[in-house]
Amino acid sequence: CRDSQALSQPNVPKKNSTTAVSLAILGLVAALLAWRIVATNMAELIVQDGGEDAAALALNWNKKNAQAQFSEGLRIAKANPADATAYLSSAIRNNPTDGPAYAAIARLKEDNGNLAAAEEAMQAATQMAPRRVDVQLEAARFWFRRGDIARAMGHMDVVLTFGDSLRDELFPVLLNLAEDPATREIAHAKLLKQRITWWPQFFNYAAAKATNIETLRVLFQMQTGGPNAVTTKGLQAYLQRLQRENLW
């Protein structure tokens, strides 16, 4: 009878043991979460600090840090294009809206001769970063290399609109296109069908720097009657150039 009563008693030690295991698991999970937070924060700090080995050090803390993957991909791009592409692809997986990473992949694909993949990557880059000046400038240069001047100028418009500090550097490129009869129309005529915020400044630049007065005349005609009508300063610059050439 005593034996049957003993058997019917609850096993208190088992309950205590289960509770202890649960607490241990919770403690382990909390520790892992805390470590993950520390590792993530350390990786971010290292990347922000910069330095030649910053990306590699950051990846030691957090292998999924997209910025570190991007930076490491750029660092080794020339020496090891395959590994660079792998890093950049991982950066995109961890940050699918990373326009600069797509642009970097496009350049690697272009250098490797895979032009279809390069075009696809560059298109993704500009879609993900529609107003990032660095990405749009890379896209403009890409399409210039591909011979698609009209498409390149569409990206150049974004660059010159949002990156006005680059105008002094890029206006000579645009003027060269305007000076060449083979590229003048395709580079500027289509663009001038819409409002271009930087056009008045460029026209004034062209009035002063164009080597051929015919270039200026054509640009003047292109803008006439459209949304980029000549400004007062532009007209003055145009007339002054005509006077300088003894044509007015």
Where are these regions (language model features)?
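Structural motif corresponding to the intra-repeat A-B loop/turn of tetratricopeptide repeats
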Residues: 78-79, 112, 146, 177, ...
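Canonical positions in the second alpha-helix
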Residues: 57-58, 90-91, 124-125, 159
